[in-house]
Amino acid sequence: MDIRAAEISAILKEQIKNFGKEAEVSEVGQVLSVGDGIARVYGLDNVQAGEMVEFPGGIRGMALNLESDNVGVVIFGADRDIKEGDVVKRTGAIVDVPVGPELLGRVVDALGNPIDGKGPIKAKERRRVDVKAPGIIPRKSVHEPMSTGLKAIDALIPVGRGQRELVIGDRQTGKTAIILDTFLNQKPIHDNGPDKDKLYCVYVAVGQKRSTVAQFVKVLEERGALEYSIVVAATASDPAPMQYLAPFAGCAMGEYFRDNGQHALIGYDDLSKQAVAYRQMSLLLRRPPGREAYPGDVFYLHSRLLERAAKLNDENGAGSLTALPVIETQGNDVSAFIPTNVISITDGQIFLETNLFYQGIRPAVNVGLSVSRVGSSAQIKAMKQVAGSIKGELAQHREMAAFAQFGSDLDAATQRLLNRGARLTELLKQPQFSPLKTEEQVAVIYAGVNGYLDKLAVNQVGKFEEGLLASLRTEHKDVLEGIRNEKALTDDLKAKLKAAIDAFAKSFA
């Protein structure tokens, strides 16, 4: 066997020439100090604002403060394994999360990692969490209803697709219940509605108890609503940076549907806790505090998040993202800093009151203080026809009720108004987990405003409504289908509906 020296030397030369080409270039820095979920890092001169960095042990962080001599990094995870002198690597990527239909039915953390034990998520696409909201040109004014299934909201404070409607109230007034019922109300459309009407739901839990989030997921699962929902959870035991990031992560997941011509609904529960987490991070990063020790850009924090909910025009796929942010007030104080900020950003608010809740008026919506700035353009014509008068009647009823406390001798007209108001208030009550379809709401409210309840005792109103709906669902399906298809009460439908209610009222008495 002869050894060809020339051949071997050529191979060796070739290998030496290509050696070391694949050396990994990564810019690194050193931890100067760490504590309270914040690390100060020396080096990383070219790091971008909002870029992911990696600590030893795979813990991620995000560069937020870029100062002349160091970088302030918030840590997504436990900081107890990070020590002074540790090496920090740049990843070169701005913080992003997985998006797409693969996430439906899953519970994830603020970085999109699954926390429900159902295996990895094989998403085909990732998106940045913090992107610019759509401009003015790609948008269209809100005109399709986003039905919540709650009479008090769909009739009086309608929410449209692409709207941002704030749910505000003290603790334990049923804020989360409104979001949950809205999610459950989408079930019939997902089961047998057209694809273009389907509404995908995202629920972002910020700073909630784990037991509360688990309960929420359990209800969604039991009622078959988890299959079109995504739950993003940054619970009370998660570090502040995760609670700060969760709403943006959820929003990016919702935007995937919006930008693909579909419809999504996102509930942020709740933004007061996100603001508190952001305040904690800002103070630890030594940013100057402002009112109530919140940083100066806490308004911008919420406005850039909520501006991303939009209705896009037909050239851009006609998709929409509807936002239901939640704010928890202290002692019904709507004029505190964060509540006023979010009220001024959103297109209306649903104001829930403790007093109403304890009086048994649930959902505890204060109809006087709640508004929808989109209004009736987010209702179908049939609902406009029946609900037009109900708001005025309830307002008159509230005014009269305040006076009636003083005087006992009231004339017949006032008495009639008070009676009607009491029955309409009773009619707007609704138990949890029982959302109604729009056509059913129209039928019930039609009965209310046309005096069918005036002769009944107040405690009979609920039974009357139940019976009427049962009768319509079995014997008069054509009326409900007519309203659903026509989306308006034509004279023919009105006559049929009137006949159906008349027949039922006779048998009920």
Swiss-Prot record:
Gene Ontology cellular component terms for the protein in this record: plasma membrane; proton-transporting ATP synthase complex
Keywords recorded for this protein, A-Z: ATP synthesis, ATP-binding, Cell inner membrane, Cell membrane, CF(1), Hydrogen ion transport, Ion transport, Membrane, Nucleotide-binding, Translocase, Transport
Main location (coarse class): membrane
Matching InterPro entries: ATP_synth_asu-like_sf, ATP_synth_asu_C, ATP_synth_asu_C_sf, ATP_synth_F1_a_nt-bd_dom, ATP_synth_F1_asu, ATPase_a/bsu_AS, ATPase_F1/V1/A1_a/bsu_N, ATPase_F1/V1/A1_a/bsu_N_sf
The keyword NADP is assigned to this record: no
GO molecular function, one term: ADP binding
Any one Pfam family match given in the protein's UniProt record, by short name: ATP-synt_ab_C
First-tier enzyme category under EC: translocase
Membrane topology: Peripheral membrane protein
SUPFAM superfamilies assigned: C-terminal domain of alpha and beta subunits of F1 ATP synthase, N-terminal domain of alpha and beta subunits of F1 ATP synthase, P-loop containing nucleoside triphosphate hydrolases
Record-listed E.C. numbers: 7.1.2.2
Residues flagged as site, Required for activity: S370
Location in or out of the cell: Cell inner membrane
Sequence similarity: Belongs to the ATPase alpha/beta chains family.
Record text on subunit structure and interactions: F-type ATPases have 2 components, CF(1) - the catalytic core - and CF(0) - the membrane proton channel. CF(1) has five subunits: alpha(3), beta(3), gamma(1), delta(1), epsilon(1). CF(0) has three main subunits: a(1), b(2) and c(9-12). The alpha and beta chains form an alternating ring which encloses part of the gamma chain. CF(1) is attached to CF(0) by a central stalk formed by the gamma and epsilon chains, while a peripheral stalk is formed by the delta and b chains.
Function: Produces ATP from ADP in the presence of a proton gradient across the membrane. The alpha chain is a regulatory subunit.
Protein name: ATP synthase subunit alpha
Species of the source: Brucella suis biovar 1 (strain 1330)
